[in-house]
């Protein structure tokens, strides 16, 4: 039942004392100076843990630096060596020292004095937006085109009436779209949020050095583009509140029109929010609404021209899985087009990471169980506020990444000799169906020499914007601090699913915390490990069962096994998945390669040897398979490169060791491996810029590796494999379900049937991981099958219809798809 602590063994142990920016066992309202609150843990710390915490606590990493490869000039800009040492600040801790006044009355009125002294006035914000947008050339052309469609053969008088009608429609759309920022409303909301946030959050932490970089960026008189991850509805208010507290003007926030509800919509407009449709193609016949697109484009251009700040959520909607979702770059493309048209000199891009101990929504179990999303209403907002006031949601951490120049990024990308990326079908089909002729890859083999690098080329423009969006989301996700609830939920699901004594859980929590810091991710908590664990368990609530044992002052902690509870734990556990995802991919690939070697008849000690090249290729193919689960790596790196680097880390950890030369000479690839190697060099998984002297040289590719058999390393590999267990089980179950496919069938209907199948597996205890039945994984699996060519998608009366492609009509090919996915699944 009890397992030893998770560790990777020989990681660099140059530990440094950590700064005590904030601690869970201390007062909520303190800032730089902390005072003990007398919180006592429920059991005594062991001497071993005391020794570890005093000697092994790492220094916090500084997160959010921009990409040196893509934006080398921005890397040096706004940053100086003293910034990381500025430390953290609790934004909602306000007293008279944060105002110009002192004394008893100032202490009583500190919130009012603070918001009154903030620098916010009408002159900061955009003016005459509606008239300027309506008079822009693009909008005028769209109005004329729509009017011509309404009255194709009419007289000049009728045409004039049609134009006036379209103009009235355009003005009505802009009334919903254009925000009218009110400094008074911002101040009032700032005061209200200080009260509310102090009621249901312990604190909201920001890094003072990061805010210094943002302030420096505001002094350039360039538009700023804030691009946060999207976890909760509070995200909309959080950024505006933090910037207001630091005398930075509020950004204009792109909000979905589902929030356009009475009273609440007026508040959002006054705070800088503007509503946009979730789908731009909303004409009755399904065509592009050119008028709406022109107005949206003109609105964004006008805001940027007036040097306003924008806030866009690239994910489009709140993440229901706890992972950062894939980017939707629609509005970002408007920003890129504005810069490309030389309307403004440059735009500074700021990715933002946001982490919650517990989101105010609590969970998204209803939607993950397949229930339709409830429409927002004034009543639902009021109920949400009342519910929030009854609970405490712990800690919030907001991280602003280093601003980088969008102009520098775009110019750099247009000069890079990078070939067109492979589609998922081109990348994965040779691995799934190795006997199939690889005609598709051959057609694109020499694409790098003929490909247009002109930003005016539509295909290149789309890829450029998609890569930019992935780059931003990867940086924002990398900046997200890991919260205590993330680590505890992860340990309970994938380390101690059958339960664990609290003392052992605390030990494992401490070790995992150190592993997170070792990978250059920051933590959203500090303090004694047992205090932090108890804090997390309290926030996880009914998802965790606590049982008193016969041992004095000891408790047994068990994760709840009900489907909603497992879904909720998985949501919070996914907050730490991106820290270990590449290592988890390598761990599953090790299993796949060893399993294939064993099934191929290898025996004895040589059967444990792995070709490094084969392992890297296997891992790269798994990266492609999981690419719909979020941004796995920076787009300026190939999957091959990232996997190769991660294998190098495994060698550094001691999990993999390079085999002796005598052993390597005794190993020769089997026939299947030779065919695999012949096929894959045609695929551009490696960068064209690699040279013979790089780490990817032939001497590296030819080496063989041994897997460490130490208990410590084997347990860590098992932990990593379990992290991907729910994803791989969902994908393999979807592949099983494809065997009985009878189509064509509407995609929505197929999603419901597949989801019902996965839920049934869970209810009957067939599933190893109950969380494999979440609706998010169902959608991602079906999307992956469309991307790799299992399904063909057609539109019938604006409804997406699925049918099997000719490649996967034979049952044998569907079986190979299943076998390919199962090769990574550790039973």
Curated annotation (Swiss-Prot):
Keywords: Acetylation, Acyltransferase, Lipid biosynthesis, Lipid metabolism, Membrane, Mitochondrion, Mitochondrion outer membrane, Phospholipid biosynthesis, Phospholipid metabolism, Phosphoprotein, Transferase
Modified residues annotated as N6-acetyllysine in this record: 779, 783
Swiss-Prot/TrEMBL GO biological process terms: activated T cell proliferation; activation-induced cell death of T cells; acyl-CoA metabolic process; CDP-diacylglycerol biosynthetic process; defense response to virus; diacylglycerol biosynthetic process; fatty acid homeostasis; fatty acid metabolic process
GO molecular function terms noted in the UniProt entry: glycerol-3-phosphate O-acyltransferase activity
Claim: Cytoplasm is one of the keywords in the record: no
Main location: mitochondrion
InterPro entries: GPAT/DHAPAT (IPR022284), GPAT/DHAPAT_C (IPR045520), GPAT/DHAPAT_LPLAT (IPR041728), GPAT_PlsB (IPR028354), Plipid/glycerol_acylTrfase (IPR002123)
Chain sites annotated for binding CoA: 278-279, 288, 293, 328, 462
Domain notes: The HXXXXD motif is essential for acyltransferase activity and contributes to the binding of the cysteamine moiety of the acyl-CoA and the phosphate moiety of the glycerol-3-phosphate.
Family (UniProt): Belongs to the GPAT/DAPAT family.
The protein's role, per its UniProt record: Mitochondrial membrane protein that catalyzes the essential first step of biosynthesis of glycerolipids such as triglycerides, phosphatidic acids and lysophosphatidic acids. Esterifies acyl-group from acyl-coenzyme A (acyl-CoA) to the sn-1 position of glycerol-3-phosphate, to produce lysophosphatidic acid. Has a narrow hydrophobic binding cleft that selects for a linear acyl chain. Catalytic activity is higher for substrates with a 16-carbon acyl chain.
Name of the molecule in the record: Glycerol-3-phosphate acyltransferase 1, mitochondrial
């Amino acid at each position: 039942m009890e397992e030893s602590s998770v560790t990777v063994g020989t990681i660099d142990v140059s530990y440094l004392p950590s700064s005590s920016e904030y601690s869970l066992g201390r007062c909520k309202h303190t800032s730089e100076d902390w005072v003990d609150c007398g919180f006592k843990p429920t059991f005594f710390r062991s001497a071993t843990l005391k020794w570890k915490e005093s000697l092994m606590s790492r220094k916090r990493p500084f997160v959010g630096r921009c990409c040196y490869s893509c934006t080398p000039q921005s890397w040096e800009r706004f940053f100086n060596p003293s910034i990381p040492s500025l430390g953290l600040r609790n934004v909602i801790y306000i007293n008279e020292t944060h105002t110009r006044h002192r004394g008893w009355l100032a202490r009583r009125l500190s919130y009012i004095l603070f918001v009154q002294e903030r620098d916010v006035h009408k002159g900061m914000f955009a003016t005459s937006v509606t008239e300027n947008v309506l008079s822009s050339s693009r909008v005028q052309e769209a109005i004329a085109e729509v009017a011509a469609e309404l009255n194709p053969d009419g007289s000049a008088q009728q045409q004039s009436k049609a134009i006036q009608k379209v103009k009235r429609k355009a003005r009505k759309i802009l009334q919903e779209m254009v925000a009218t920022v009110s400094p008074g409303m911002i101040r009032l909301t700032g005061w209200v949020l200080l009260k509310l946030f102090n009621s249901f959050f312990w604190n909201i932490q920001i890094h003072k050095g990061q805010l210094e970089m943002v302030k420096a960026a505001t002094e350039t008189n360039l538009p700023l583009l804030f691009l946060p991850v999207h976890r909760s509805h509070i995200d909309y208010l959080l950024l505006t509140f933090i910037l207001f507290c630091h005398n930075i003007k509020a950004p204009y926030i792109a909000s979905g029109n589902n929030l356009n509800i009475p009273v609440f919509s007026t508040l959002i407009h006054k705070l800088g929010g503007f509503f946009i449709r979730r789908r731009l193609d909303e004409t009755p016949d399904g065509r592009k609404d050119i008028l709406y697109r022109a107005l949206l484009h003109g609105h964004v251009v006008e805001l940027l021209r007036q040097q306003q700040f924008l806030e866009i959520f690239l994910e489009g909607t709140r993440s229901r899985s706890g992972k950062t979702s894939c980017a939707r770059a629609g509005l970002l493309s408007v920003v890129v087009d504005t810069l490309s048209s030389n309307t403004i000199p440059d735009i500074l891009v700021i990715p933002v990471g946001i982490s919650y101990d517990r989101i105010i929504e609590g969970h998204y179990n209803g939607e993950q169980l397949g229930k339709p999303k409830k429409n927002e209403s004034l009543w639902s907002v009021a109920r949400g506020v009342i519910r929030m006031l009854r609970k405490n949601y712990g800690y919030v951490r907001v991280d602003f990444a280093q601003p980088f120049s969008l102009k520098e990024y775009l110019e750099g990308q247009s000069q890079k000799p990078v070939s067109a990326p492979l589609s998922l079908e081109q990348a994965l089909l040779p691995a799934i169906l190795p006997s199939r002729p690889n005609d598709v890859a051959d057609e694109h083999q020499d694409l790098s020499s003929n490909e247009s690098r002109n930003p005016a080329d539509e295909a290149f423009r789309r890829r450029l914007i998609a890569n930019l969006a992935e780059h931003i989301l990867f940086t924002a996700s990398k900046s997200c601090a890991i919260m205590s609830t993330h680590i505890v939920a992860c340990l309970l699901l994938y380390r101690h699913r059958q339960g664990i004594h609290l003392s052992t859980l605390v030990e494992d929590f401490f070790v995992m915390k150190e592993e997170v810091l070792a990978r250059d991710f920051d933590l959203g908590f500090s303090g004694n490990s047992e205090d932090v664990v108890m804090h997390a368990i309290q926030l996880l609530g009914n998802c965790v069962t606590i049982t008193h044992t016969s041992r004095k002052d000891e408790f047994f902690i068990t994760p709840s096994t009900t489907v909603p509870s497992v879904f909720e734990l998985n949501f919070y556990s996914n907050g730490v998945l991106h820290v270990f995802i590449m290592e988890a991919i390598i761990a599953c690939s090790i299993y796949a390669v060893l399993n294939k070697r064993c099934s191929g008849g290898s025996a004895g000690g040589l059967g444990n040897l792995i070709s490094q090249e084969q392992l890297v290729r296997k891992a790269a193919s798994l990266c492609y398979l999981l690419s719909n689960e979020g941004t796995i790596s920076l787009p300026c790196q190939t999957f091959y490169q990232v996997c190769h680097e991660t294998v190098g880390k495994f060698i550094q950890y001691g999990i993999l060791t390079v085999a002796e030369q005598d052993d390597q000479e005794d190993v020769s690839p089997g026939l299947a491996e030779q065919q695999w190697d012949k096929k894959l060099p045609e695929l551009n998984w490696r960068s064209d810029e690699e040279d013979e002297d790089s780490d990817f040289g032939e001497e590296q590719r030819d080496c063989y590796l041994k897997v460490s058999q130490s208990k410590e390393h084997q347990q860590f590999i098992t932990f990593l494999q379990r992290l991907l267990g729910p994803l791989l089980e969902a994908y393999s179950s979807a592949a099983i379900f494809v065997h009985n496919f009878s189509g064509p069938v509407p995609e929505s209907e197929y999603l419901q049937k597949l989801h019902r199948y996965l839920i049934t597996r869970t209810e009957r205890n067939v599933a190893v991981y109950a969380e494999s039945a979440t609706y998010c994984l169902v959608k991602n699996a079906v999307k992956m099958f469309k991307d790799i060519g299992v399904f063909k998608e057609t539109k019938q009366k604006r409804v997406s219809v699925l049918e099997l492609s000719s490649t996967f009509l034979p049952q044998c090919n569907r079986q190979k798809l299943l076998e390919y996915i199962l090769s990574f699944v550790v039973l």
